[in-house]
Structure formats: C-alpha cells, structure tokens
Amino acid sequence: MGLPWYRVHTVVLNDPGRLLAVHIMHTALVAGWAGSMALYELAVFDPSDPVLDPMWRQGMFVIPFMTRLGITSSWGGWSITGGATPNPGIWSYEGVAGAHIVFSGLCFLAAIWHWTYWDLAIFCDERTGKPSLDLPKIFGIHLFLAGLACFGFGAFHVTGLYGPGIWVSDPYGLTGKVQSVNPAWGVEGFDPFVPGGIASHHIAAGTLGILAGLFHLSVRPPQRLYKGLRMGNIETVLSSSIAAVFFAAFVVAGTMWYGSATTPIELFGPTRYQWDQGYFQQEIYRRVSAGLAENQSLSEAWSKIPEKLAFYDYIGNNPAKGGLFRAGSMDNGDGIAVGWLGHPIFRDKEGRELFVRRMPTFFETFPVVLVDGDGIVRADVPFRRAESKYSVEQVGVTVEFYGGELNGVSYSDPATVKKYARRAQLGEIFELDRATLKSDGVFRSSPRGWFTFGHASFALLFFFGHIWHGARTLFRDVFAGIDPDLDAQVEFGAFQKLGDPTTRRQTV
C-alpha cells in the first residue's frame, strides 16, 4: 500500500473486525504494562519504614493506585501500614498484578482471533451485505455498560457493601487506612477533600450513564443531527472519544497537583501548596502551643510531634522541587531519611527567639536570614563578610534542639549554628542516608509531579488530536473535494478532480 507512517491506521477504517482486534490488543498492552510494572515495583519496594521511607519517596507509581482502591497486603507477609499481615488471599499486590497479566494474555489471544476472523456476520448490514456498524447503538451499549460499572464502583466497592472501601485519611496524612465510605449527598459532597463525594458522585454519574445508555439504545437520532454530526463516520467516534480522554486527563492532572480525597498524601506525597502555605508547620506549632497550654515543657511538647508530621514539613518532599527531567525517585535525590534530628530554636545573645526564613519553592539557593517574632531581621549569614552587621558571630546566635534525636542538645559554635540555620531553611531537619543509593543531593519530584506532568502533556496533545479528527470528519467533503450537493452520478477515476467534468482524463 505504501502508506506513510502517520496514515497506517487507515487500514482498519472500513474493517470493523480488525478495528476491534487492534483495540483488544491495545487493552492487552495496557494491562500487561500495569501488571509487569506492579511486579517490578514490588521487587524493588522496601516496606520496612512506612513513615520515613514511604512508597512515594521510593518512586512507586502503580502501588499507590492499588493501595487507594483497597489493596494493603502482600503475599510476602508485609502490610503497607507496617508490620506483619495474615494471608491476604487473592487480592494482594501480587494477586492484582497477576490478574492484570492473565487478563493481558487473554486479550492478546482474543486480538489474534479477531484479526484472523475479521469477516463476521455481526459486522455486516443485512440490507447491503457490506461491512457496517450501527454507531449510535454501539454508543448506547458502551454508555450503559460504563454507567453500570461506575454505579457498581460507587455503590458497592467504595461503600464497602461488597468490596474493601477506599483509602481514607485525616487532613494531615497521619491516620490513613482502607475503610468503607458513606455517600455524601449534601453540599459537602462537592468538597474535593471529602471521600463521601467519591461514592455519591459515582452512584449519581453511574445512574445517569445507565439511563442515557438506555435512551440511546431505544431512541434513534434525528436525521439532521445524524448527518450534521457525521454519526455514521467512524472518525466521529475517534474524535469524540479523544475529547472524553483529554478532558479526563486535564481533570485528574488538577486533582493530583492541587490534591484531593482521590490522591492522599500518604500514597502520593504532599502537594507543593502545603509547603507554600506552611500547612504542616502551622499544625506543628498548633500542637506545640496546645502542649505548652497543658503545662508541658518545650521539650515534652516537641517530643510529642509525630515524626510523620515533621517529615511532611520538609522541602525535599515538595513535588515542585524536582526538575521535570531529573530521573529517579526522591530517595535518589536527597537520600533515604533515617531520623528527625528535632526542631531547632535559634536565639540571639539578648535571648530573643529567631526564626529562619524558609526557602520558597522555586529557589535553588536562598539567603540565610533569621528574623524575630515581629519579622525584623536580627541575624544572617552574609555574602560579603566586610559589610556584615547581622552575622551569627556578631549577633551571638545559639541553637537548641527540641524533640527528635538531638532533644536537649544546644550549640553556640558559629560554624555549627550556621550549618543548622542553612538546613532549617528547608523545613524540619532530618538525617539523610545518601550512601546506600549513591544519592546525588539534587531534589527529585514525587509520583505526584510525574503523574501531573504526564497527564497534562498528553491532555494537550489529545486536545489537538480531537480538533484534528473533529475537523476531518466534519469537513470531510471539503477535504475530499466532493460537492455535497452534487446530484450527478460520479464515476470514480473518470476525472482528475472528483466530480469536475472539466478535468476528464484523456484516454491514451
């Protein structure tokens, strides 16, 4: 045929049997990738420290998606929440991976069968005997089945009526676990951080899909609408399908990047906005203040801060800190977190408490500036020593740690104080192991960042694909050069330009 690479899919344009075959093969490839990727991740995943080395720090991509749907245990005897687990049965991480691979193999065989036996009676129009698909009817069938699956997921899986429920956590990502969720039918169901909205929206959307599917199965489209939207053309199906996919991709890119109940921070890591807004820092200070109000000492109050909460308040877990093209997990960047050193409190020689100004997200370097409670600069690490007025040495800054491994330890040596002031720019201070993975010290993004970038990029690409194929199907007659109002019988091949009698070919 000699088709250029960008036109090879025309071979299935008027061949319903093989069009079905290539779609089944595509499903086989997707399911096969998912199962294989899950097995690879399980082979390299270390479940030993869910607090300081969670899945998102290790660069896991498919494990978080399995976990949010209710899978928490492995046939290897470990649980995602830590500790040993009894036999989880078929629906373990390995079981899900295996199910995808088996499904992929069955789809592979089905694709070969449909490629071989392409000329089936079901694809032929009874009146003409030629290949033909009733596309509005097929649309109704697919809408009905998709609605059924959507309703079933919301009504049974999410609610725990017949299924495990989904991953639910508190606003600070500390107490997450898989549990059943009751549908939220009030206005709170529209809050993207309320899990009940997932159940209610799937039930509502599924019901709508079922009803819409039945409508399209029982009601034929008007002739003008059928012709106007080119409902008889398979490229119309391609165009509208691409529209559905790119719209969904834009939506999930948003819910992933800005955060929602569907993207828990325990599974995908915190969002950049939680660093920008000091979200975890405020909660930590609130807990410390509450402890002091209960007559606890500063050391006791800080010691009660969960290590998990302190770890979220560290810039290395900000997905916007990693470059888009820096390959590898977060652990390959700043290293594997080993322990929280504690919260450093800086004071000048007059006893004023000083706060290190934190590094904004999009800075690689940032001046070390210490301010008092009123925001007045009291100390810094100067760029030019000759002009310094606020240097650590001149101001006499000391640091004392509360909570963590260095609880109660204080330093007055200027070099040590400056070292911890620099590290305090990055949030809470952690000991990081860079030797094990030969980590290079350059921040990496989390799976939250990769997912967002990938889906936003492909959504943009698919948007242009929708415009392209939509234009092709709507203006097919224009592109082909055939006048849609041409009444004369047209003989293909008789004219150089189809339907133009002034370009009749000359016989040799």
UniProtKB/Swiss-Prot annotation:
Keyword Transcription regulation present in the record's keywords: the answer is no
Q: What Gene Ontology terms for biological process does this UniProt record contain?
A: photosynthetic electron transport in photosystem II
User: Which SUPFAM superfamilies does this UniProt record tie to the protein?
Assistant: Photosystem II antenna protein-like
The note on cofactor binding and number reads:
Binds multiple chlorophylls. PSII binds additional chlorophylls, carotenoids and specific lipids.
Q: What is its main location?
A: plastid
InterPro entries from the entry? Answer: PS_antenna-like (IPR000932), PS_II_antenna-like_sf (IPR036001), PSII_PsbB (IPR017486)
Give an example GO cellular component term for this record. photosystem II
- Asked if the record carries the keyword Chloroplast, the reply is yes
The domain of life for this entry's organism is Eukaryota
Subcellular compartments: Plastid, Chloroplast thylakoid membrane
The transmembrane segments are 21-36, 101-115, 140-156, 203-218, 237-252, 457-472
Record's bilayer topology term: Multi-pass membrane protein
Alphabetized, the UniProt keywords read: Chlorophyll, Chloroplast, Chromophore, Membrane, Photosynthesis, Photosystem II, Plastid, Thylakoid, Transmembrane, Transmembrane helix
Alphabetically, the GO molecular function entries are:
chlorophyll binding; electron transporter, transferring electrons within the cyclic electron transport pathway of photosynthesis activity
- Family, per entry: Belongs to the PsbB/PsbC family. PsbB subfamily.
Function description: One of the components of the core complex of photosystem II (PSII). It binds chlorophyll and helps catalyze the primary light-induced photochemical processes of PSII. PSII is a light-driven water:plastoquinone oxidoreductase, using light energy to abstract electrons from H(2)O, generating O(2) and a proton gradient subsequently used for ATP formation.
NCBIfam families, per the entry = PS_II_CP47
Per UniProt, subunit arrangement is: PSII is composed of 1 copy each of membrane proteins PsbA, PsbB, PsbC, PsbD, PsbE, PsbF, PsbH, PsbI, PsbJ, PsbK, PsbL, PsbM, PsbT, PsbX, PsbY, PsbZ, Psb30/Ycf12, at least 3 peripheral proteins of the oxygen-evolving complex and a large number of cofactors. It forms dimeric complexes.
| Protein name (record) | Photosystem II CP47 reaction center protein
- Upper classification of the organism: Eukaryota, Viridiplantae, Streptophyta, Embryophyta, Tracheophyta
Q: Which gene encodes it?
A: psbB
